[in-house]
Every structure is written in C-alpha cells, then in structure tokens.
Amino acid sequence: MELVEVLKRGVQQVTGHGGLRGLLRVFFRANDIRIGTLVGEDKYGNKYYEDNKQFFGRHRWVIYTTEMNGKNTFWDVDGSMVPPEWHRWLHCMTDDPPTTNPPTARKFIWTNHKFNVSATPEQYVPYSTTRKKIHEWVPPSTPYK
C-alpha cells in the first residue's frame, strides 16, 4: 500500500506542474519539487502554496513570478520580492492568508515593490563622520637628480 501512495504522489507531482517540461522548469528555478494547494496569488504574480503533510516550516512556499516591474526575474529571484502581507502568512505569523483576511493599510508599506539593491552600485553607503584610524602612506614627492 505504501508503494502505491509513493507512486501516486510522484504522478501528482509530474501532472501538477504541467507535465515533464513544467516539472523541470520548477525544479531548475526552485531546486525543489512539491505539490500543494494554491492558497493565493499576489499583485505581482507570485503564487503561494501550502501542504500540511510537510513538517512545520516547510509546509508553505512561494513560486516567484518570472517578470516583476518590467524586470526579468526568471533566474534572479530575491526574498524581498514577497510583499509584507504575504510574508506574514509565509513565515507563520498568521494562519489566515491575505486573500481571506486582508491586512490594514499602513503608510510605511510601499505600494509598489522596490528591488533589493544591496551589493550593487546603487546601494546605500553612509557618510563616515569619524576620522580614519589608519592612514595610507603617501610617498614624498622629491624630484630625481
């Protein structure tokens, strides 16, 4: 009986992702193949799933969209692509997804997603207000004879 359940779940994984091509696409993007119930989709196109047969912490996941705000994100996914209301549900801060219980609007939450610019030339670098402890050596400029 257990072998039948394993085979049944394997067939569900292949058919649930749209055949072999869809299965490979999900595997290369997420490095994991899971099946679950679609809980909802955010305004950017990210899809959120849940499978209560998995253990806590691995039972909720997101499949990121391939295009966000005009940028191709097929290979360049980032954890900051999840909106705050879905972040609450994804990290088990609440049991109700935003589709059934929408959160209250806050003025500090962005209306449109801004990409994480860390480790890029656009990153924020604060101005240093303290003096350097170590100064680089500048050789004296004496003309050669």
Curated annotation (Swiss-Prot):
Modified residues (N-acetylmethionine): 1
Gene that this sequence comes from: Ndufa12
Subunit structure: Complex I is composed of 45 different subunits.
UniProt topology in membrane: Peripheral membrane protein
Pfam family, one: NDUFA12
Cellular-component GO terms for this entry: mitochondrial inner membrane; mitochondrion; respiratory chain complex I
UniProt-listed GO biological process terms: aerobic respiration; mitochondrial ATP synthesis coupled electron transport; proton motive force-driven mitochondrial ATP synthesis
Statement: the UniProt record of this protein carries the keyword Membrane: yes
Record keywords, A-Z: Acetylation, Electron transport, Membrane, Mitochondrion, Mitochondrion inner membrane, Respiratory chain, Transport
UniProt family annotation: Belongs to the complex I NDUFA12 subunit family.
Subcellular location: Mitochondrion inner membrane
Protein name as annotated: NADH dehydrogenase [ubiquinone] 1 alpha subcomplex subunit 12
InterPro entries: NDUFA12
Keyword Mitochondrion: yes
Summary of the function given for this chain in its UniProt record: Accessory subunit of the mitochondrial membrane respiratory chain NADH dehydrogenase (Complex I), that is believed not to be involved in catalysis. Complex I functions in the transfer of electrons from NADH to the respiratory chain. The immediate electron acceptor for the enzyme is believed to be ubiquinone.
